[in-house]
């Protein structure tokens, strides 16, 4: 049987990919950030209602009934355990797995760059990320705006103070009435508005850093001590593509556990299965996570932009359909 066996990326594009990844490693070596390697599978996983995982079972000696394992959506939990153990500043280039979309900007298995800087807040980490983006993308310095500013400038509605009626009216102007009208979850509505109405309007000429996300979308970030409506979280966009998601990392174990439990309660309300909480991470936070900021960046999307390609298949050898 004849099959489509050849890579979707040209050999020259794969060479350029390798060169860019080498440059990223050099970037961190010059800053004395240590490269680490953590597991691709874990007994626990993310509780985020918007992330869907792959899972398998280990059935080796002593586990005849099977031990459930989850492929990691990010190395974050393991890397924070290293930070709590005294690793200092670290980075990783790894494979991540999400049982979600497959298309122009998505592959179920993808390459991620994640790094953590001890003693940084999210603003200082944005400075460093700006340097990396200028190196790889050969672009100008990034623009910065708050989440609130982006919403008001593009959609004319405040995401922090606007009513659900006002948010649904903004969705209606985007032709999203059928989706927005029955929606009762504020964050789901905000994410819909941001993804459809805002993302493709910012960061067209240079990357855009959007920071101060609503506190309800804090995930693993600290709440801003000056404005409890927002979290110390940022995302990065360029030419309509989300590139990265970063936090001034939450170091309070009780608060982190409460957020995981709230996620699982929400999953049950939505008819989804609750996910096993990573108590190793909670124990690491109890032992003491150093004050730090961290960010995860999609390498495939970054290289796609750097090489002027239209699809991540052009910069990956064997995407999902032919893997």
Swiss-Prot record:
It catalyses: D-beta-lysine + L-lysyl-[protein] + ATP = N(6)-((3R)-3,6-diaminohexanoyl)-L-lysyl-[protein] + AMP + diphosphate + H(+). This is Elongation factor P--(R)-beta-lysine ligase. One of its GO terms (molecular function) is ATP binding. Coiled coil: none annotated. It comes from Vibrio parahaemolyticus serotype O3:K6 (strain RIMD 2210633). ATP binds at residues 98-100, 107, 242-243, 298. Substrate binds at residues 74-76, 116, 249. Homodimer. Belongs to the class-II aminoacyl-tRNA synthetase family. EpmA subfamily. It is an enzyme of class 6 (ligase). GO terms for biological process: lysyl-tRNA aminoacylation. One of its GO terms (cellular component) is cytosol. InterPro entries: Aa-tRNA-synt_II, aa-tRNA-synth_II, aa-tRNA-synth_II/BPL/LPL, EpmA. Keywords: ATP-binding, Ligase, Nucleotide-binding. Its EC number is 6.3.2.-. With EpmB is involved in the beta-lysylation step of the post-translational modification of translation elongation factor P (EF-P). Catalyzes the ATP-dependent activation of (R)-beta-lysine produced by EpmB, forming a lysyl-adenylate, from which the beta-lysyl moiety is then transferred to the epsilon-amino group of a conserved specific lysine residue in EF-P.
